[in-house]
Every structure is written in structure tokens, then in C-alpha cells.
């Protein structure tokens, strides 16, 4: 039992409208956590399918309400880290929806325009973060409930790798793919909360000990973009995504088209196969006795799980596994997947008029993520001409949570947006604690120079140009005959016989250096070059024997001058 509450919760459904609909239980005085800790001074809210000891857990269904005997594992960890709990927030009933209107406690509005949906199912959590009522909030995410509301409200939604945060004490939606998610106005706060919340829990059968990738994406990275995208007629959203691609390119990303079909087919399995039986199984004991007290369309979704048998479930799981294998090679071509968080916005009255199809549309780019065991981060991207937010989602393999956060923080700050709906500017970017990749400096002198035929071998390995400079005056440069593409040979000679040769110095991740060196054909190789400033770097060298019969081009000062000298002069 929890002490310190001075406000009791009324679990009788009293439909609210406007901002009041965001809360189901709001404490008069926040429940204080530890007096010190990583989260000291931060106030949070919990989605009301997450237990807080001594308070009712309703899952937005009054007939289901029960007083929680103890805190959910994640709530306890956050309190122990110093955060204070302000209350519990509204949701789509039993976390079954992506729009925020499926609750007897009221439809939660969008924080930018109250006539539009907030997104769900973690509707209240997103709203109270976006409007500055709390510093962060817990949601849950099975099909996008921790991402869609973030994208529609100009905030950050962190959907961790499955099992990274314990779900013990959370009312399950589909337990094998449920994740506790985090809403915040900045990536920095979301990562602070993640570090406090994560950890293996032996009492949660789906908890995992995961070693997170701690090396950020390099200055050059590849991001996937679906070859075909659907925005359901929303041209403003379509244009916003084009701009998002351009923003990610400006951060060093190279777009790569991917086949979205395996991901889309996996998403379809969530509700249109025997996998939906897991949603029914999650609340079967209650639902079989109280079906009439569950609101539509949640009732129909849960009831649909009854029509499948065990063989159907085995077939669906096999189909999902096949799609996972079909999608896996995508990660050989890209480092991260870029998607719209939601393809469009819908008005509340439109959603109520067509609750199934429009809800399905909102999940067009989220439903597959948990099924395929990926991590995801939704970050604000822009405000559309109509004033509504547009968010993007960065998706990566399991364990890429911190990598996504580092890139997401860079992207968020490049957007120039304010925090949520508060109008407050973003604070400066924070050090998220990732390790910088080990790198090596390599000087290139010929076909690997910027704009030359082999420069792509550097770029595709994440190498970054540091400077254009010269060697010390103790080298000679030769044009090697018979090389394709044409290449020079750099040979060290006594200072009295040499000259300074133009080079470019590139910085390359050490992890990719070996594969780069393996591409270098004889008589070329890698050695140590001395630069004009006296420093030494790795760089291209040539066997002296190979220069016999080669053209000495030292007097030109570099390979680029040599190539230019061979170009035909255009007639005046």
C-alpha cells in the first residue's frame, strides 16, 4: 500500500471532454520518490494499465477496476530513481486502439487542435507531456501506442526493445509483444528515464538481459525509405515526409529504397490472424463474464480472438517467422529505417464515424515493429501548414535503442521546433553517454580523392573528410600505367629529391578499416605518411619497383592537377 495520497480516485466512468479527459486519477500531491537519484526533480504520469500500489488500475474499463496491491516494477524503479508520480492517465480501453477516443472517460484531444485525435492508446500520457503538466510519462506499446500519440503531439516517443523494461504489473494487451514506452519532450529526458527503468526482471517471463549497442551511427549512414508510401490523401503529410528525408540527408544520411511489403504483411497479422487471440487471452477471465461492459469496437476485437484454434495460431506464428526472415536482409543495406510515425491526422468526429478503418490507417507504419522485434523512436519533425505536428520514426534492430536516441536527438534539434505544445525552446543537445567509435586517419592521394572514381569506398564506410593538405617534401608521385581506374603511386625519397604532394586526410571508423585495406590492389598498399605539419597518418604508398616506366608527375603537385592536365581544352 502506498502512503502520501491526498486524493482518492473515482473509477466510475464520467466522460470528460477537453484537457480533463487526459487524466483518470490525478493526485492532489505527487507521490514522492527517493530524495535523490538520477530522476530527482522530475514528475511523471503512468498510463492507467500500469499498476500504482494503492490506486485503482482501470485499463479504461470501470468494471475491470481493481486496487493494485503494489507498484509495477517500472514504477518502483522510477520512484527509486527520485521521480515523483502525479497520477494515472486515460487510454484506449485495454490499450486496444491508436486514436484516443475509445474510453468511457472521454476522448483525449490533440494538444495542438482539440478537434483532432490525440492518438492512442497512450493518449493521456502523450497529452500531459505535450502540454507540460509532467516531465515524462509511461505508456505501453503493442502496435504503436507509444509512438503514434508522440507523432501527433510533437513529442518524443521511445519504444524500447522488447523485454528491456519489465512489464510486470502492467495489464497485458498482447504479452509477447507488449513494451512499456516513454513519452518526453526531449530525447535526453527519454534516455534518462530509459536508463533508470531498464533492467532484467526474473519475475517477468518476457524480460531480457540485453546488451545495447553503444556506438553511435557515424557521420555517414544509410537510412531506409519504403519504395511506396501511403498517406491516405493527406498531401501535407506527404510533403512533410519529403522534407524529413532531406533533413536526415543533411545529417549525413544516404537514403536507400526498401521493400516495405514484408513489414506491411507482418503488420496485418496483428489483428487479421490468430495472433489476435493473444489479446483475448490477456483478459479472458474478465471478458467472458463482462463482455457487455466493454465498449465497441474494443469488444469486437477481443471477441474475434475466440474464433481461432491452436492450429491457427501455429500457422500465424510460422507466417510471422517467415516474414521476419524475409525482412532481415534489409539491415544489410541500411543502418536505420525512416518512417512517418502516422500517415495523417483525423478529427475526433471522423474517427467516431469510422473507428475501425481510420484507426487501422494510423498504424500503417507502426504495427510491425514489435512483431519483428525491432526498437523504435518517434521524434518531432515539423509543423504542417495547418499547424498540426508531423513526426517521424527511426526504427532499428533489437538493441539499437541508444543509437536511435543519439540520431533522434540530432534530428530533433535540427528541426528547430519547440517542446511539445508548450512553446518552450529545446535545451542544448545532451551527451547521451554513447561511446565514440574508434577511428583511424588515412591520407588518400589519387582515385580515392573527393569526386574521384573510388571515393565511394570511403563514404560507404562512414569515413569523413577532415582536411585537404600536403605531404612533407619527401615524396614523388607517379602515374601508374595500366591501372583501372587510373591510379598514382606515391614513393618516399630523400628530402633533397622530393616535393610536397596534395592529399586528403579522411577519418574512418576502425571497424571498417580492414575491409577498406582489403580492396587495395598491388603494387599499392597502406603505410605511414608524414604530412607537411610534421604529423604522421596512415596513407597510400607504392612499391618503388612499380614506378619503373611510370610517368613522374611530381612537378604537378598532385593527382587532381594531373587529371585536369589530361582533360581536352574546350574550343573557345
Where are these regions (language model features)?
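Short helix-loop capping/hinge segments that flank enzyme active sites or metal/cofactor-binding pockets
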Residues: 38-61, 218-222, 274-324, 328, ...
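Gly/Ser-rich, acidic/histidine-flanked active-site/gating loops
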Residues: 44, 50-53, 64, 77, ...
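Short glycine/serine-rich loop segments
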Residues: 71-72, 76-197, 370-393
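Acyltransferase
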Residues: 235-259, 283-289, 313-334
